[in-house]
């Protein structure tokens, strides 16, 4: 009898301990949000009180990097934990180069650890040739856009929910009707003339419903916003919002009013998620991370310098300078993260894989380019051991590597002249030191050659040096 009592007490004590090691994880990903677009990262014109409060109660990562400088490859790095030299999707392509079933993702790892998983919003990891791609690679629930071009349209005629087409009440202009066949590679793109259902509003409601439904057991919510991206098909009227609100009275260009409203909506919706976690009394067992997929855009009539969206950094979306890849990142976890702090070590999207695996008590996939920053969340100092690496296949191609305080950029890949910057003293990358530091240039080139793995789907002009 005594043995049974001891065994019973052991089981009772052990189960809650295990549950406590599996926090809920919410990853909020803004689309084309620049480092300087939030008040807590230096924004002066636009107010972001909820995100500023989130940073004050949590912590900021001041040197956090996106996976790439455009959406599809950046999201591929995020999902696979592999950097741009080895991930599946390395560019924005209309071809069906996608993560396939059987390939490990952030979602599949967490699902295997007992998490309920959801992707709500913009999937856009390549151009899937089916409607079930997110579900096929680990998400129990999906609601949103499958391809990136569809995600340009804030008032789409349809969305996808778990492999099924969901018709909406919106209607695009006649010139875009040919793109409303869901089976087309760029299906759903266009500009609406009948605007009744704003997709970002549908996504936040679905996200809140998912949290409520799964509050009793571990969940992973990947809330992939499609703002403040522009509707590129809309020309200079691409910053589409239902209501300009307070910005309607501003003496600003119309696209900038729309951009301001989008930032306000991002702030509001993030606050709604945090409020719900508190209401459900699960905030202390939930890690929320807010970040962006790349640097600020200059599309839809919006100008990146109007709000100084890249902050103190040079470059924007489609550049491998800091402004194109360094992104505003906030972590919030009441009771675990000590409020008001910041971490200045450099991390990147691929590190979510190792970090989430550790939090879930799961084994991280083999062969990933990922290091855990969980110690940082617990207030401990930790630095990344390995270099960071990027490739980009537009604008003639480019590659970049960060090793310690140094960052090198080569454009075009393989054959271009190397630029070298000391980010500790020159974060704006204004002074190229390549001519003064030949040994560091040699080291950078060696890293670039080592970290690039050839892929027949992704080719550049010029030959790789041997």
Task: Briefly describe each language-model feature range.
Residues 2, 8, 18-419, 423-466:
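Formylglycine-dependent sulfatase
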């Amino acid at each position: 009898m005594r043995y049974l009592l001891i065994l019973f007490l052991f089981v009772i004590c052990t189960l809650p301990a295990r549950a406590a090691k599996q926090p809920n994880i919410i990853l909020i990903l803004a689309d084309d949000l620049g480092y300087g677009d939030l008040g807590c990262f230096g924004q002066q014109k636009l107010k972001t009180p909820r995100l500023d409060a989130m940073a004050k109660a949590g912590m900021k990562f001041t040197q956090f990097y996106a996976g790439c400088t455009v959406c599809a490859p950046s999201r591929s790095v995020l999902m696979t934990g592999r950097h741009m030299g080895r991930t599946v999707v390395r560019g924005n392509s209309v071809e069906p180069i996608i993560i396939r079933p059987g390939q490990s993702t952030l979602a599949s790892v967490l699902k295997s650890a007992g998490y309920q998983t959801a992707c709500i919003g913009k999937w856009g990891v390549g151009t899937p040739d089916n409607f079930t791609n997110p579900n096929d690679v680990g998400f129990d629930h999906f609601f949103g856009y499958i391809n990136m071009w569809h995600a340009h349209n804030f008032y789409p005629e349809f969305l996808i929910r778990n492999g099924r087409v969901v018709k909406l009440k919106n209607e695009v202009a006649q010139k875009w009707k040919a793109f409303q066949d869901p089976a087309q590679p760029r299906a759903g793109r266009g500009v609406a003339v009948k605007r009744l259902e704003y997709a970002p509003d549908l996504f936040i409601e679905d996200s809140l419903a998912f949290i409520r439904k799964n509050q009793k057991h571990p969940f992973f919510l990947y809330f992939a916003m499609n703002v403040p991206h522009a509707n590129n098909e809309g020309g200079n009227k691409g910053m589409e919002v239902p209501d300009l609100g307070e910005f309607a009275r501003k003496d600003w260009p119309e696209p900038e009013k729309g951009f301001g409203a989008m930032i306000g909506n991002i702030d509001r919706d993030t606050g709604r998620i945090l409020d719900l976690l508190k209401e459900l009394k699960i905030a202390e067992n939930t890690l929320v991370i807010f970040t962006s997929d790349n640097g600020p855009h200059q599309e839809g009539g919006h100008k990146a310098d109007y709000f100084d969206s890249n902050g103190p950094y040079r470059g924007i979306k489609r550049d491998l300078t800091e402004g194109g890849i360094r992104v505003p990142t906030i972590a919030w976890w009441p009771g675990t993260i000590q409020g008001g702090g910041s971490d200045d070590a450099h991390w990147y999207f691929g590190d979510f894989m190792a970090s989430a695996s550790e939090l879930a008590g799961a084994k991280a996939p083999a062969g990933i380019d990922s290091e855990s920053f969980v110690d940082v969340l617990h207030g401990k100092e930790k630095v990344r051991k390995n270099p960071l690496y990027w490739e980009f296949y537009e604008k003639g191609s480019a590659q970049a590597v960060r090793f310690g305080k140094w960052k090198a950029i080569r454009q075009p890949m393989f054959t271009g002249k190397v630029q070298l910057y000391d980010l500790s003293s020159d974060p704006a990358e204004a002074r190229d030191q390549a001519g003064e530091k030949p040994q560091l240039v040699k080291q950078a080139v060696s890293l670039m050659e080592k970290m690039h793995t050839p892929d027949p789907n992704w080719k550049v002009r010029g030959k790789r040096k041997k």
